[in-house]
A protein has these predicted regions:
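Active-site and NAD+-binding cores of ADP-ribose-processing enzymes
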Residues: 1-31, 36, 43-161
């Protein structure tokens, strides 16, 4: 279990998919910080949580191509987004998948998918990330502060409010 802090404009009694949001040009999820003072700068309500995270999105290695295809195929904005790649849907899938895979790391690839295929649908993004067995991504900021973007609300246990 990992200790983290949530901050927001309102008090939260439990975490659900309604808490999933977009965060500063990132993947969609529930945002936590590893450091309490940093969390206090983000909002008036701060709570300590424990995160039980099993499978994390890699910030170093590439994603599985089948997972990328799943995320594109099940995206709510799929038809609209695919039109940006080609008029022929089959060709558009190939081009879109190649475009996403050029992101390099799994984290960057899923960030591209979130922005291009799940715009205005953060909850669906999180649910599909859980379907391909990811709980969260952890982003180090070099100053020993880690941001956790959690897809699965079941991984969050509130310690105190």
């Amino acid at each position: 279990m990992t200790e983290a802090y949530y901050s927001g404009k309102t008090k939260v009694d439990e975490f659900t998919f309604k808490n999933v949001r977009e965060h500063e040009d990132e993947v969609f999820g529930i945002f936590f910080l590893s450091e309490e003072n940093s969390a206090r700068k983000k909002g008036p309500y701060v709570m300590k949580v424990m995160l039980k995270l099993n499978r994390m999105v890699s910030t170093l290695g590439p994603p599985r191509r089948n997972d990328i295809i799943y995320m594109i195929t099940n995206a709510p904005n799929k038809d609209e987004a695919l039109m940006n790649f080609d008029k022929d849907q089959r060709e558009a899938y190939f081009k879109a998948t190649d475009h996403v895979m050029k992101g390099g790391t799994a984290h960057n690839c899923y960030k591209i998918i979130a922005q291009e295929f799940y715009k205005d649908h953060p909850q669906e993004f999180a649910k599909n990330m859980i379907h391909i067995r990811y709980d969260a991504v952890a982003l180090s900021h070099g100053d020993k502060i880690v941001s956790y973007i959690v897809f699965n609300p079941k991984c969050v246990q509130i310690v105190n409010q």
